[in-house]
């Protein structure tokens, strides 16, 4: 026999109200971890830092702030809802609304798919560069909490991001045998922190832009911690003379 849970559960939230969860139907969410993701984002300042560099494309102030739109998009992706179309369903989700600054029972919903689409298309090359810089600054702040590191291991890697339409920049890659994007990612090999990411066309070689990115990252690390030892780790896709 199954045991039914009848007790209510209380969650810590950023809002000045108690959040109780029950299992008797009613308003249902499939993403119970959103309160913790929201709290982590508030402590790190990730979405706030990104929103500061997203161009405001609206001639008049909309119902949703840039910070709220960015947080909605980031949290949706973090919960596995990467498609923009998911916004039309999740804009009424009680926990996602709470994470983005709306009361679950309020009559106001989050942004729809067209608004999220315009948010992403508002980005320019310059704003993407500034967002990457903001991510790097967040990494430096997190990495330095325990003091100046003696060594930093930079993990360079590329990954395949399949596409299923005519997205701008999508190309066919012979090795992966699919149309895709081919982003370059750099992680801290010791902590797992993402340092930066670079979106590239699908037919780009794995090592493309890695040297320029390495020089920029190493330069900033040495500015912050002059004595730090820097090691680089990458797979065979980066075994080219320039690297």
Regions found by a protein language model. Name each.
Residues 1-205, 209-226:
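Dynamic "connector" segments at or just before major functional cores
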Residues 157, 227-239:
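Acidic/histidine-rich, metal-coordinating catalytic segments
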Residues 165, 240-243:
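A short acidic (Asp/Glu
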Residues 206, 239-240:
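Alpha-helix N-cap/loop-to-helix initiation residues
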């Amino acid at each position: 026999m199954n045991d039914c849970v009848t007790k209510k559960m209380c969650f810590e939230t950023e809002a000045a109200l108690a959040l109780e969860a029950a299992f008797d139907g009613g308003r249902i969410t499939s993403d119970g971890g959103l309160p913790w993701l929201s709290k982590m984002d508030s402590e790190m300042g990730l979405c706030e830092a990104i929103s500061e560099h997203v161009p405001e494309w609206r001639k008049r102030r909309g119902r949703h702030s840039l910070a709220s739109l960015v947080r909605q998009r980031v949290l949706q992706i973090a919960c596995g809802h990467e498609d923009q179309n998911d916004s039309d369903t999740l804009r009424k989700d009680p926990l996602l609304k709470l994470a983005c600054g709306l009361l679950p029972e309020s009559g106001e919903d989050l942004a729809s798919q067209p608004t999220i689409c315009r948010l992403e298309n508002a980005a320019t090359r310059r704003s993407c560069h500034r967002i990457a810089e903001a991510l790097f600054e967040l990494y430096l702040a997190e990495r330095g909490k325990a003091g100046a590191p003696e060594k930093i291991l930079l993990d360079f890697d590329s990954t395949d991001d399949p596409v299923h339409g005519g997205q701008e920049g999508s190309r066919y890659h012979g090795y992966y045998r699919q149309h895709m994007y081919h982003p370059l990612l750099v992680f801290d090999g010791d902590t797992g922190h993402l340092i930066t990411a670079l979106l590239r066309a699908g037919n780009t070689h794995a090592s493309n832009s890695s040297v320029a990115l390495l020089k920029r990252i190493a330069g900033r690390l040495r500015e912050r911690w002059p004595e730090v030892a820097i090691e680089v780790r990458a797979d065979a896709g980066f075994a080219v003379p320039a690297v």
